[in-house]
């Protein structure tokens, strides 16, 4: 079962929840990065938050280059989860706590995502662990949400460790268990992680790594 219908529904409910509760669209700090998602005027020099809506990509994002580079077939949901939309990260409440689903802000963000998924998968190979790829963060960035590449199930994972708990048998069922979380935009502190400099998806991963390192 594709995760796309569940993702479509969640993104629709997400924006409707903001409109119903706050009377406005969700906002996001783009840190100078343009996106088709932005509603209204955009000033690259401004550090203000922007209102945004998810935008369907004209051409589906593909991970064929990642598969070719690693000689690995990725679980099919990766193309629908990351390749259908341009969007900001979306916040959620769940039976397992609060968290954030990652999305792609623009084409440069998609390129950065691919490179970091390659890095994550190479780390798993080096550690002789089963392949996973990430879809979000849990508990304010303390843990990753990852997909088992062998069967599409969703797990909690701390970088460098084996996944610790299965949350759902599929990405679709995981998304269906979430509800939108209404919160003001947060401007994430820039942290010294050169490999994760792009402000779209990976501001979230900077925060996660910062939290993990700080707790060791």
Curated annotation (Swiss-Prot):
The lineage of its organism: Bacteria, Pseudomonadati, Pseudomonadota, Gammaproteobacteria, Alteromonadales. Interacts with the SecY protein in vivo. May bind preferentially to an uncomplexed state of SecY, thus functioning either as a chelating agent for excess SecY in the cell or as a regulatory factor that negatively controls the translocase function. It comes from the Bacteria. InterPro entries: Syd, Syd_sf. It comes from Shewanella sp. (strain MR-4). GO terms for cellular component: cytoplasmic side of plasma membrane. It is a peripheral membrane protein. Its main location: membrane. This is Protein Syd.
